Amino acid sequence: MMQVSQGTIGSPWHQAYHSSSSTSDLSGYNHEFLRRSPDQYSSRGSMESLDQASAAYHHHLPPAKSTNCIDQLVHLHNKRDSAYSSFSTNASIPEYRSSPFSKERSYSMESMHSRNSSGQEGIKHADIKYIKTVYDVQRGISEEYEVNSSSVKNRNYSRQPAYNRHSIGPHGRLEQSRFFSESGGFERAAPMPPTRSDSYALTRHHERPNSWSSLDQNRNFRTPKAAGLHSTNTSSNAAQQPKHVHGDGHLHPVLERSPESSPLIKPKQVYSETPQPGQPMLPTGIYPVPAPEPHFAHAPQPPKNNNGRLYPALAKEGSYGAKSSEKVLPFSEPNKNEKDTQNLRSKSVGQYPMNHSVKEREKKQEGPTGFAHYKLHFTAGPDISTSSLTNDRNDQQPLRLDNIDINEQQKNGTKVAEEFSVYAHPAFQNEWSDSKTKQDIASSDIIGLHRNSLSSDAHGEHEYHNHFNIASSSHNKMDERSNRQADHRKKLESLSFTVHADEADGPSSNPLKPDESPSPSQKKSYDFTRRRLSSSSSQSSKTDGNKLSSVFDKVCKIEQREHENHRSQFLCGNINQSGLSTRGQNNKGSFTMVEEIRNKFISQDQTPNPNEWRRLSSSHSNEKVTGMHQLTRQGIVYGLQTGDAQKQMPEKQAEKMHSYNQEQNILQAVPDDDNRSFNSQTMPNKEDDWQCAAQDTLGFNRAYRNSVKDAQCKVLEATSYRRKDLEISPPHYKKPEKNVRPASAPFRKKSSSLSPHAPKERHSVTPTDNCASIQESQGVFFPSRIGAKRRITAEQKKRSYSEPEKMNEVGASESESAPLTVSKMEPVASFSENSVADRRRIFEREGKACSTINLSKPQLKQLQQNALADYIERKTGRRPSSQETRLLKERSQSTYFSGSIMDNQSMTSTSSMNSLNEHNLSYRHREPLSKTGRVSSTLPPGLTGFFDLSSFENNPEYPENRSRSSSFAHQLRSERLLDHRSKVEFGKGRETNKPKEVSLQSDDDVIITSSRRHGKSASAEDLLDRLPQPPALHVRSRSSPASDMKSREYMSRQEVGNKTSYASASNKEIRSIKSNHFEQMSFTPSFKNHIDTGEDPVPENSSTIQRSAQLENQRNTKTQSISGIYSPHPETKQEPLALPIHSVPAKVTQTSLAHATFDYITAEEYLYSGKRGKESASPTDNKEISDQEWCLPENSSSEDLNDPERFAKYTSAQRPQSFETKSGNSINETVQQNKSSGPTAGPKFSTSWKSNGMWSSGSSEAETTFNHGKISLHISESCLQPQSPMTGQEDEGDDEVFVKEQDTESFSGTFVPPSPPPFPPPSLEDALLKQRIEKFPLVPNTLDEIWENTEEASTQVKVKSNERYLQCASEYTASTESSGSYLLNSGITKRDTDGPLLRLSSIVPAPEPLASPVDPTKPIEEQETQPHGADTSILQSSEGNFNPSDSQSTLPHVRSELMSSEDAKSQELAKEIVTKDKSLANILDPDSRMKTTMDLMEGLFTKSSSALKEKNQKRKAKKQIDNIIAPESEXKEEKRETLDNASNYSAYYSTSAPKAELLRKMKTIHSQIGGKEEQFDVNEKKAELISSLTCKLEVLKDAKESLIDDIKLNNSLGEEVETQIETLCKPNEFDKYKMFIGDLDKVVNLLLSLSGRLARVENALSSLGEDASAEERKTWNEKKKQLCGQHEDARELKENLDRREKLVMDFLGNYLTGEEFAHYQHFVKMKSALLIEQRELDDKIKLGQEQLRCLTESLPSDYLISMKVSLPEERRSSLGNKSLPPPLTSSL
């Protein structure tokens, strides 16, 4: 802002004000005396100081935009060299050591003056031509003014009259600076560019306004060097100083001390330090500088008695300067009025008239040129004691004369004395000490006086003079000042200095006793200095110098008051420190908006009498009179009202907060009641004078600031500095704060807001300064930031780098800013966590001990991610996987990091005032979040919203608020899937607690998403987007992967997990079942989902249906939750499905749901469903309940479901057709339910996971388990989405933090999972099973539960004796097809449970036990043997699982009933035979672990890790179930374990390879059998087993026939679908469809063939004995390797097919209606499922045949002949007993 001619600046600039010295080169200055170095002021009064303490500045002069703007922008110590640096330093901020509000206001106005006056060693100005850049707060621009070194000389405290320095009062700093630069006529040259030393001095002066102790100032004012040189000038200066005090007072808030702003006349204060070369103003005083080159007002390091004194080293010191200060001093007093002060600023800055009026006018004219608006950091006025001020006041004319003389003397070196005497004026000194730095009170006073004089000139210099003389009486001064304050206030509103005039007036009016602690005034000076900073102080200094005559009178008064105040301050310097903080508290009590404070200050400036103010300050009440001094940033008005100070006790507190913020900016001498009190007490006139100077300076500064504002506005615009943040401080900041620098705490936010580009350290500086002000006011702490440079910790620096956007907040001391912010801004809680430190604390509160500050950006992200994970873990009880967290983190980082509300709120992290404002705005929005889940801004917006879903949902824009950079709302939309899933699932977890609220919210978002995804609206793109994993479609390929993809919302995700295989889907399903089971268990309605979707749900056993339905519901619910389909309302639990339904083709949804239910009954699922079954009173009740519940969402209707016949038409064609026959009621219920939920989620969900399950042949078992019906139906159903959705969910679950557990919670409590697809129409086998059930009454629910558990296990292998054989055959086929034996068992049993599930396809007499399906692992022989025994028991256990009565009863019970003696006997026979005839062990051993085609097929579909996990879990669960179901038969349990993946174990493969060897072994064993009886018994057992196996084979054959019928029906359905598609779709799309269907057959057959071959090879290898030759083993291994490679290729083909299925489903969804789409899905899924089932049945039949052959061969020929007769009877009995179990096909 201020450019310093390098040639002229020379070393003094760099030495004294080197940018580094500003911050660090304070060593050159006694830190005690460095009240505020221009650097500090540059940071405070300068752009930076304005940025930091914009409140201190006029709002026009944003603190960040003052001299320190460069510092903020550049963050360089050499910023002083830049325009900003010169501005800040030249802003009349002498570099003087600022003690943190210490008692010694080393740079109090007095001390400054005394230093200057005493030494002229004070600030020595090198012949440097300084271009003073003054930032006009009001104008918001910085203007560059060349400060004449002569002015600086004038401002030299020893050489120059204080008035010159004072003419550059803090208030006039800006305008004075302009005037100084403008008033080139003034002897002052442009002050040297302030170095960071200046800022440091300023900062420290801000921090240590006490250095400007009133005593020091009084002493300085009273005993300026000018006193010796020219007592008149001294008195004049004293008088001027008071006026300058006013002008400076105004400047003091902006106390940017430079020779211009600092008093031209050194006070008598002796500066310990001589200005270093580079430091225009040495701490010891103003050092002479060539007139053309103003020097920075370096506050000499005076004794602590020179506390508040600022020395304008750079202030143009010339005779005119001195004269000006003389004039300005009088005007400064009149300029106590804001207008006058402003005028004085503009005028006095510009004018250092030889005559008071002339000088005033000259100052007005010179202001910018003549005066560098630098307030002396130390006032020359300390020497000019109150008496001198009084004398000055009394001698306004003499003062003017003195000023003239002083100007001459300044030329002669005596001007400094005058000026200093003016500054020596206690009031002026107090003003400076009030002005935080109280740059030479002479400077500030003179500046203020000049400003006042300028104001008086503008408003009547003579009036000021007269009034100043009149102002000898503080009342007159107060009156005039009040008037002028009104003007000054107006100006202050425009100007950055509002309070100073009042302060100056205050002290003038209230000459406080010198004993009164200077700390209030010092604090004020400190605040003011902060606020005034460089530009203001320089401006005020010149202004004061200009308006010396009127200021003289005022200075006299001010001197008296100031002298008294100075004494009181001197005595109370420490008190002032504490008092300063007190005053800050009092003044800042109402510190709300800088504007308000400024306005209040203006009013106070206008209204309060200096005496009143002084009384307050003299009383040094904590209610500092500066209640008025609340500085509004725009106006940065220092309210000097006494009444305001009193009434602002609360305001003072807020004002303190604000003051600290403003102190940084303003050096709030006036706002700080403590400073004021201190000044007014010790130097009563000092504050008044300072205020007068501030007023004068304000007047001058107004013009100057206008120019500066123009420049600064440009700078601000360039820096994107926002001044609105200056106005941000809410009025509620009234709560009394410790002298927390108002500017800092509010400016934390404000600063950040003020200057987005301002470094954090700037903002931090302000907070730091606030802290410093507080601390300094307490006299204890030094600012974390010295000068413009902020002391930032390594952590803060790290954070600044980690969050470069918040570099402006880098320096912010989290402790300072946060505490200050919190304490001050508690009303605005937004600052509680504005800073990164706050966020870090948040994370720590989240259990993140590590500090974000210390973290690198990646570490911070990790920390946030961890916090998110912790939060999720807390909320959901499950810690999300790293991937999930990663997704969340990525999602959240985009939102959270860029724009999290917390970040926005974080002051340190806030990049700009806008950020802060947004924080504030968003804070209100964020508050709910903070309250609800302030967990961590690291949490992704969605999660954050989840933390407070209601808040988030209620505030859809909240995420945006939360993260302005990336609104979560948009991100939520873009990441709708992830967020929704997280949200939904999280909501689910929460939903248990508040289901509807979260659900609705989630559902709204989710449903929208899901409906869009779920329905046709959910395009393939959605699926692709949502489901980047096409493999999820593996299941689709099984039955209707397209449907799965159709319900891509759920299924695609889930299918991704399930894509590889149905088994994977089953596994996922199991996994999901686990979670879902709990969910569904929590709400039995899950079963309804099954019914809802259940095309054929009712007839099945209610428990079975319930199981499957619940499992399906769980899956569906997961799916729904994922897609947001789940209804927020428990009643509408399935409604979420309904919601997507409209998006999804209704038929698809219905069909999918209908099939989905059966698809997902795995062991775990079954167990969970069993648990849910337990919940239900009875299977029937459960079914009814679930039906009802599922029916609840009838709104989601599906044409298919609505038209049961129509649907049954397809289903019957699909073998579920029996669904109609199954039960009209069940169909109707199912239809209704499907209408409600089925259409919604069913088709897609069912299809999706169904296709997954069905498609994965291995998982077809699981599906079979899930599908408690015919394999065909189950295949389609199992292939339906329920499984894939679940799988997807589980896959999603990995992504979603809250999904599974929450799903469980939410489902258990709140959500009813979408109704699973209705069970397929009952088959004949179902009818048989039903009959059997009728024969065997239903057992209690407990049995049902056990039965369900057993069913899961039996799903694997267990089937009742004959039923079991049938089921096993059908299961085998079913599992092969899709659901496998699981589907057979669970499906058949379910249908039985639900009622006679009439499966058209399961026409095979149920009585025929399907030994192979149930006990595929068992050799068929054994199974045949077991038909009555083990097989029967297995069948019974599985059927028991399926049949509520039979299997639902505890297996033992069921076995006793359902398991016919034949079943148990067959098992026993098999065991006995194996034990006696080892040759049959491999074939008959129920525990045989031979691999089957279904096993390998299952592997094909369990590619996804989640599916594998589910599979493993399912196996474990099945094992457990098996243990529960058939604990009695270890072989059976082992068999179940073996059959975990596929109950359809084709021992045929194992038998074929080792067949000959086994036979040989059998023969050998037989030959070795000892005892004919034993042999006879074995033979009998074998015969019995053969009979049983024969029956089973018959059942299997019947099942195969039924399966063939199902295949035909499905093919007919496919033809219909194809016809529809051909008519609806484009040719190329139809071709794709045709190719897909054709390839589906090929791929499925290929997989089956390869799986079968591979299974046989593996079995052969496993059967190889140790004696097997290596060559043989090698041959088998090579075959295995070859087959494995081929099988892998086939899997790839399957994956490709799944992707193609996705595409087909996507475009078909656009053409087909819901019903048609459901038919398509059913067709596709059933196609693959039926193929698998057919292959499975073939394998089982082969196995049974081999078992029979082996058994027959093992029997003696004679025995065989005798046995043939009995076989038919056994067969009949077994059939009669086993007719109940539906054929294996029926399970399909």
UniProtKB/Swiss-Prot annotation:
Tissues expressed in: Expressed in epithelial cells of the cement gland.
Gene Ontology CC: adherens junction; apical junction complex; apical plasma membrane; cortical actin cytoskeleton; cytoskeleton; microtubule
InterPro entries reported in the protein's UniProt record: ASD1_dom (IPR014800), ASD2_dom (IPR014799), Shroom_fam (IPR027685)
Subcellular location: Cell junction, Adherens junction; Cytoplasm, Cytoskeleton; Apical cell membrane
Bilayer topology term: Peripheral membrane protein
Compositionally biased region (Pro residues): 1313-1323
Keywords tagged on the record: Actin-binding, Cell junction, Cell membrane, Cell shape, Coiled coil, Cytoplasm, Cytoskeleton, Developmental protein, Membrane, Microtubule
Main location: other
Pfam families listed in its UniProt record: ASD1 (PF08688), ASD2 (PF08687)
Source taxon at top rank: Eukaryota
Quaternary data: Interacts with F-actin. Interacts with ROCK1.
Family: Belongs to the shroom family.
Biological function: Controls cell shape changes in the neuroepithelium during neural tube closure. Induces apical constriction in epithelial cells by promoting the apical accumulation of F-actin and myosin II, and probably by bundling stress fibers. Induces apicobasal cell elongation by redistributing gamma-tubulin and directing the assembly of robust apicobasal microtubule arrays.
Name of this protein: Protein Shroom3
Taxonomic lineage from the root: Eukaryota, Metazoa, Chordata, Craniata, Vertebrata
The gene coding this protein: shroom3
